[in-house]
Swiss-Prot record:
Alphabetical list of InterPro entries matching this protein: UPF0145_dom_sf (IPR035439), UPF0145_YbjQ-like (IPR002765)
Domain of life assignment: Bacteria
Protein's recorded name: UPF0145 protein Nmul_A0734
Family in the record: Belongs to the UPF0145 family.
Organism the protein comes from: Nitrosospira multiformis (strain ATCC 25196 / NCIMB 11849 / C 71)
Length: 106
C-alpha cells in the first residue's frame, strides 16, 4: 500500500475515494527514561530515548491507518497528516495521530 503526504501519486490516477482514515498511538513515558532524558537535557544533546518513542508511536499510528484503509478496500492513502501531542498529568504521555484519505489508484 502506498502512503503519501501529497494529494496524489505521480503517474497514478485516483479511481475511487474510499473515505477518511486515521490511526492513533498513545504511549506512556517510563519514569526512568524521563529521568535520564532530563539529565541529558540539562547537559545538552539529543534524547535518543524520546526519539525512539516518537518513532515507535508514529509507526503504530501509520500501521493502524494503513490497516483501516485496507479494510475499506483501498490500495493507497493520500494527504496524510501526522500530529504529535503530549497528554496526561505532567505531560507523561505521548499521542501521535495520522489521518489521510483512503483511495484506489491505478
Amino acid at each position: 500500500m502506498q502512503l503519501t503526504t501529497t494529494p496524489g501519486i505521480d503517474g497514478k490516477r485516483i479511481t475511487r475515494y474510499c473515505g477518511v482514515v486515521a490511526g492513533e498511538a498513545v504511549l506512556g513515558a517510563n519514569i526512568f527514561k524521563d529521568l535520564f532524558a532530563g539529565i541529558r537535557d540539562l547537559v545538552g544533546g539529543r534524547s535518543g530515548t524520546y526519539e525512539k518513542e516518537l518513532q515507535r508511536a508514529r509507526d503504530i499510528a501509520l500501521e493502524e491507518l494503513q490497516q483501516r484503509a485496507h479494510d475499506l478496500g483501498a490500495n493507497a492513502v493520500v494527504g496524510i497528516d501526522i500530529d504529535y501531542e503530549v497528554l496526561g498529568k505532567e505531560n507523561g504521555m505521548l499521542m501521535v495521530s495520522a489521518s489521510g484519505t483512503a483511495v484506489i489508484v491505478e
